Amino acid sequence: MYPPKEFFGAARNIEEGGSLTIIATVLVDTNSRMDEVIFEEFKGTGNMELHLSRRMAERRVFPAIDIDRSSTRREDLLLGDKTAQRTFLMRRMFGQLIAPQPQGAGYELTQAMEAFLNRFNRTKSNDEFLQSLVS
């Protein structure tokens, strides 16, 4: 595991600053214990995780992103305070949609994404979408 982990860690170790973006993919939920071990080992080396939903893709709901499981490390440093707070609110709202009843709405992941996309498509920008969540 050491050589691949060292390679992925290279994105943080560029001489004289700068940055290197490395995109890696891993297939999980394969029922293979080895795949899970490899995923968990490399999980800590990345700055961002994007989880795709097979169920959404099969139902032709795009982007098939599992918002609840996807995240960026230190997202608060990338966004301004107001945008970060609204993004955290969006994530909490999405979590409430997919939480089982009576605590949440009990939506399937696909239904929750469709609800978000319907609302998103009625706005002209990401900022307007996030603002619509607080009004």
Regions found by a protein language model. Give the residues of each.
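P-loop NTPase catalytic core
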Residues: 1-135
